[in-house]
Structures are given as C-alpha cells and as structure tokens.
Amino acid sequence: MDSPAILPTTRTLCPYCGVGCGLEAVASPQKSVVDAGHAHKIRGDRQHPSSQGMVCVKGATVMESMDKQRLLYPMFRSSLDQPWQQISWEAALEIVVDKIQQVKQTLGVSGLCMYASGQMQTEDYYVAQKLFKGCLGTNNFDTNSRLCMSSAVSAYSLSFGSDGPPCCYEDLEITDCAFLIGTNTADCHPIIFNRLRKHHKQNPHVKLIVVDPRCTATAEVADLHLAINPGSDITLLHGIAYLLKKWNLIDQKFIDNHTQDFEQYCQVIDHYPPEKVTQICGISLEQLETAAHYWGNAKTVLSLWSMGMNQSFQGTAKGRCLINLHLLTGQIGKPGSGPFSLTGQPNAMGGREAGGLSHLLPGYRSIKNPQHRQEVEQLWQISPGRINPEPGLSAWEMFMGLENQQVGFLWIVATNPVVSMPDLERVKKALQQSTFTIHQDAYSPTETAEYAHLLLPAAQWSEKTGTMTNSERRVTLSPAFRSPPGEARPDWEIFAEVGRRLGFENQFNFVDSAAVHREYVQLTAERLCDQSGVSYEKLQKLGPLQWPCRQSDQESQLLSTKRLYTDYKFCTENGRANFCLDHSRGLAEPVDPNYPFVLTNGRLYGHWHTQTRTGHIEKIKKMHPKPILEMHPKDAEKLGIKSQDLVAIKSRRGSAQLEVLVTRAIAPGTVFMPMHWGFLWDDNAEVNSLTHATACPISKQPELKACAVNITPV
C-alpha cells in the first residue's frame, strides 16, 4: 500500500465533480498528518490551473465526511436475510475467488460482472480492466459513467473518430458566445461557471445562451434563456442550423475541406423551418432567431453540455447535433470555440481513457477492433484471443442478467445503484435474486449494501495515491495524506490480490500505484489520449498536465497542450469530421391523459450523488434539508395545490411523496425533483423509482432525465 506522505501541506484534487479543482490539505500543527480527518483543513490550490484557488461548498467541507459511517472491516452473510458477520481479509478474498471459480464453471465467464464508478482513480480502473477483460476474459465491466457520460463518448467518437473533449477551461474566458444546453453549470460545475460568468460580466459583447426547461441559477444570468419543452433539443439545434444556412452564416471552406455528409445534413435540416421548431420547442420566433444570430455572428462559439443532453434515448444524437453546429460554422480547433462536454464525476474522463466501459479497452481502444485487442494482449502478456471480441454487458444489462439468472456474480465498486439506476423497483428485485453480490465501498450503511452478500472496505480519496483526469483532459496526482481507517484497502490492491489468487501473479505484481501508472500510460502512447509523457515524478514537479502529453515532448511542450484538432485533422479514416443525420424523436415516454406531466430531475448545489458523503455534512444538510417537487403556478392552481402541500407522484413503475414548491422557475407541464435521496435518507423520495430504463441504442445510456407522471394531493 502507498504510505501517506508526511507533509504539512498536500496538493491534491477534489473528489467530487468533473471540474477537477485543485485542493490543498493543510495538516494541523498540533496533530500528526495521519490523524483523523478533522486534523486537516481544506483550501483551494491557487496554483492549480483548472480552478485557480476557487473551491465550492462540497470541496471546502469534504474532510467532514471522511470518518463518518465508514466501512472498516470485511463483512459477510450467506443470504440477505442473515445478519452480517465480520470476517478477515483472508476469508473475504477466499470467498471472492471461490465464487468466481464457481460461476465460471456453471455460467461461464459471461456470468461474471463488475459495476464500478467514476469515483475510482485511473489506477483502480486499469487494474480492474486487466483482471476482467484480460485475465478472466469477460468484457462485463461497466461503470456509472454509463449513466452520465456514455452518450458524450459515442457522440465524439462518431463525429470525430475518437472520444475526447477538444476544448479547455481557458476557452471559457476568451469565447464570444457560450451556448449551454442540458447543463445547470452554476450548481453542478460551479467553478467552471465562475470562470465563464466573470468573463461574461466583464465583456458586454459576450453572449450567454442557456437552454433548459427550468430557470436555474445558470439561466438567470443568461442573455437568452430558451425554456424548451423536454425532448425537443434536436429540433432546436436543427432549427438553429436551418437559419444559419439560410442566412449564410456558415463556414463553407471548413465544411468542404474538413467534413463529410454536408449535403445529406442540409436535407435533414430542411425539415426544421422556424414555424415548426418554435411550435415543438415552445419558444418564440424571436428567441429562435436571436439564438441563431448570437451563434452565427460570434467570432468564437463554445458550447457546454452535460446530463440534460446525455441522459436521453437520443443522447448520442443530441451531442452530435450540437457538434453539427460547430462543423457548420467552423467553430472548433481554435481558442474560445468547440463542443465541450462537462464530465460529471472526478474521474469519468480517466475511466474512459483506461477503457472503463464494457465496449472499450485502455487508450481509447475498441473491443471490436482486432488490432486494438492484440495490442492490449501483448502488453498484458496474455494469450492471443484472450480478450473477447464482443462488448460486454452495459450497466442496465447487468441487472437484467441477474433477473434472468445469466449473471451469477456482481461486484459493485464505489457506486450506489440502489439509488442511481432507473426503474429502481425492478433493480431491487433483480438484486434480491442475485446469488452473489459484493459491495466494495468506503461507507456503510448504503442502500446497495442492503442487497449485498459481501462488503469490502475501500480506502478513498486522501487515503490512497493515484491520478484523475478532469473535463479539460488535465491529469492531477492525488496523493495519500492520511491512513485508511480500520482495514480499508485501495481498490486497485483488492483487484490485484484477487488476480494473483486466480493464478495471474505476473500480471499483478505491482509494488505500488506508481507502478500501475507506468504500465497504464504505455497503452496510451500514440493514441489521441497519449499520456506516455506523464509520470508521478513529472506531476509532482510540474503540477497537473493535459493530454496529449507524449514521452518525446520537451518539458515546455508538456505545459502547452490545450486543444485538440487545431490542424482540423480528425481521427476518422479520411481525417474528416462527420455530420449527424438523425431526426428528433421527442421523448421515449411522452405524456398522455393518465400521466400528463413530464418529470425531470437533477442535482442540488450542495449535495453529491446519493449523499454517502454530503449527507453527513451539517452545513450541506441545512442548505438542502429535504427533497422538494417544483411545480409551475398554473399546474398547481389546476390541482388545487400550494407550496408545502404533500403530493403523490406516480409513474408507470413506481411512486414517491414530496412537498411542493410552487415556482415560475419550472415550465408549465413539467415538474422537477432532486436526485439525491435514497431510502436511507427519505423512505418515499426516490426519483428513480419513477424513471424508466429506455436507453440510447448507441450509448446504452438510459433516459433518466424525463418520464411521464401524474400528481395528486395527499
């Protein structure tokens, strides 16, 4: 295990969102640096290029959650109705290995699954890929990034030939027009928003467009807020393209030299004249034309998007149709411009680079590509053909595998699917049928632990050393500066020990996380996400580094890689970017007389995911003491409801009960509910008991952002 450094101040990375803010953990002079969490104070790292010393309430209070309700020892029970028993690590590892061997004999390796998390460090991801996809020969490794970022991955891949956001945070401060769609950046990525908002306030010519059915803190400061109807994103984007083409506000030279399928794209957008678009989207002609003018007349345009676009059964198409506007106007590969997807979790980017979805391999490689498989097999020193050529199960498919008895072993790591998965009642029933479920986490109790047979205590941020990559492709070293409590271990060490016990000693002979990292970056060499020039030593000396960062680069070059595609050469076979030709299909579950409201959901400023950390922080609990349903006054009046009334919300799958907040911040016909409450925090406020699992056929990301509900007073 990596020992915590004995330093008065440790530069590290915030473990919450994908902004990747730099933090400084300052040890109390009265106490050892390896004492409990309250011996350290957190402040923003002014030298970190992504955050420049800024920190939000989550990062500022993170130490308050480090020692509350931690899982300290391995715990086991043979069935869900049995009490937990503390066991040794030796016994726990024996159980894991025995169960893997049993399932291999009964169901084959396709019956083995791991469902992990963007909370893991890149080293954790990498060792898990090697264990499952390499040594065990199953691609059934997926993560909660499937629920947040997989549509962005497939959008970039299909449009540009590779995943990877082409922009950087500096672009926030030099763009002439920022187009935000499907992102409440002020609440969900606050430090990014602070940088953009400062630029916007100081430069009157800069335009800020926000597309969101809610009037969020982000929308409140916009020059133009387009409160479109849920599900009409593609219609809006095609409508803007229609006007840009009509007004000749396009870059024909860029289109001719660097894109393909433009003529077919023109045929698509011809179906989206303004009168049709305004009716479907629920906006005025003036608003639509203003948006197109802002985009078309700006010297540089930067678009930002997140879960509001990705969490859709057309999530890939939505991302690609936004990219279309950049291709149409040549707004990519230059300062202040480009399509910028904002990652949700601190290492969702690093996970993608390490192959952390069931169709990927490390280094932005594809499972389906035989050359990619061969390259990975050679480095891993496993037999040719060991890596299965077919993608593994996605997150939802894993739980359905439990339901139909095709999955006999589910290893859940650093995530809480009994709160975060759609159609929760079905997920819970599937877990009740599981023959063996592991929950490897830093905290207990969690909602998912209620459905597990084995609990493995994990070291978390501050207790293990590793790297994470933020939304602007910047890799930061996150060193251990405290000792893990109890018998908690780093995730990668647990995976490696299981691998050794399965007979793969040579593949898992890592002495520390730096050794894992050295092997991992070899698989990124000469790939778009090249990190062969990144090492722990360079990160300690130079600070965070953006990729591509090649081994051959001089030190001065390592600090200058800001944007991708500056030469307009894309990663497709012919080097041209692809226009998306998809039409809008609306919502997967439209409203009807029985379910007349669209329920959307999202984050609150203070909370994070399912509250395993933030639910223990008093300041944040006071900010957000309970979940509330937002409803427009017109809808409330029709139902005879006023603020603070209790209502029942029902979908075709489940129900919840919440207090109402009557507000004009939400559009008529749409209601909003926060996503953070599981049954341990409120016994009747699970938003995902209402949502459905219909997913984008390309990214397999569920449409978590919209479902049809009815509402009645209680």
Curated annotation (Swiss-Prot):
It holds the Pfam family Molybdop_Fe4S4. Binds 1 [4Fe-4S] cluster. Binds 1 molybdenum-bis(molybdopterin guanine dinucleotide) (Mo-bis-MGD) cofactor per subunit. Residues 7-70 form the 4Fe-4S Mo/W bis-MGD-type domain. One of its GO terms (molecular function) is formate dehydrogenase (quinone) activity. InterPro entries: Asp_de-COase-like_dom_sf, CT_Nitrate-R-NapA-like, MoPterin_dinucl-bd_dom, Mopterin_OxRdtase, Mopterin_OxRdtase_4Fe-4S_dom, MopterinOxRdtase_cofactor_BS, Prok_molybdopt-oxidoreductase. Its EC number is 1.7.5.1. Belongs to the prokaryotic molybdopterin-containing oxidoreductase family. NasA/NapA/NarB subfamily. This is Nitrate reductase. It comes from Synechocystis sp. (strain ATCC 27184 / PCC 6803 / Kazusa). The gene is narB.
